[in-house]
Amino acid sequence: MSSMVTPQHAQELSTGARELGIDLSPAQHEQLLAYLALLIKWNKAYNLTAVRNPDEMVSRHLLDSLSVVPFIEGTRWIDVGSGGGMPGIPMAILFPERKVALLDSNGKKTRFQTQVKLELKLDNLEVIHSRAESYQPEVPFDGIISRAFSSLEDFTGWTRHMGDVNTRWLAMKGLHPDDELVALPSDFHLDSAHALTVPGCQGQRHLLILRRTA
């Protein structure tokens, strides 16, 4: 384990995952901590996340990402505006049988993501350096997820072409974004909304699941 990742971090991850109802294998636990170590190391130079304190990263990044695990269905996912790789990298670690793509227009961030893919040997992870509106997938994704990426209007507008009526759009938010829902494009609707409790995180967390009507 990296010297930057402490036994307290390891314990917080184990306990938090259990509270979320997630049974991490020893290998997954180790991979998540290896990812955390890379995030701490690269964040100093690359500004991957505004969270500077490593002691806050387990709850605000790892456990926050794991909180959406019960809602992941289907085999092909894309994390849009992935930044430091949340929630896509934890998803790829948890679901080795699913394909997860990370999309970001920032070259520093995609370089970091590629390094994580190589070091953690995540064969199911694809890193895409592109703007959302420019990226053209060959087939629609089963799920499109974003974490604090943009407004719901922009998120759906920029990624509409990546999915179809069978796709689920998952938007990870803080407060329930009532004002953003009003501005949702007419061909999208709210399928369900879920208040999430993230161990160690203060403040509200919500997951909104959206679908296309046509």
UniProtKB/Swiss-Prot annotation:
This protein's source sits in the domain of life called: Bacteria
The enzyme class is transferase
Where does it localize?
Cytoplasm
GO cellular component term of the entry, any: cytosol
Question: Which E.C. number(s) belong to this protein?
Answer: 2.1.1.170
Asked whether the UniProt record includes Methyltransferase among its keywords, one would answer yes
Q: Which Pfam families match?
A: GidB (PF02527)
Residues the entry annotates as binding S-adenosyl-L-methionine: G81, M86, A132, E133, R147
Gene3D superfamilies hit by this protein: Vaccinia Virus protein VP39
Please tell me where this protein is predominantly located.
cytoplasm
Among the GO molecular function terms of this UniProt record, one is:
rRNA (guanine-N7-)-methyltransferase activity
Record key words, sorted = Cytoplasm, Methyltransferase, rRNA processing, S-adenosyl-L-methionine, Transferase
**Catalytic activities:** guanosine(527) in 16S rRNA + S-adenosyl-L-methionine = N(7)-methylguanosine(527) in 16S rRNA + S-adenosyl-L-homocysteine
The record ties this protein, via PANTHER family, to:
S-ADENOSYL-L-METHIONINE-DEPENDENT METHYLTRANSFERASES SUPERFAMILY PROTEIN
To which protein family does this belong?
Belongs to the methyltransferase superfamily. RNA methyltransferase RsmG family.
The job of this chain, per UniProt, is described as: Specifically methylates the N7 position of guanine in position 527 of 16S rRNA.
Kindly provide the name given to this protein in its UniProt entry. Ribosomal RNA small subunit methyltransferase G
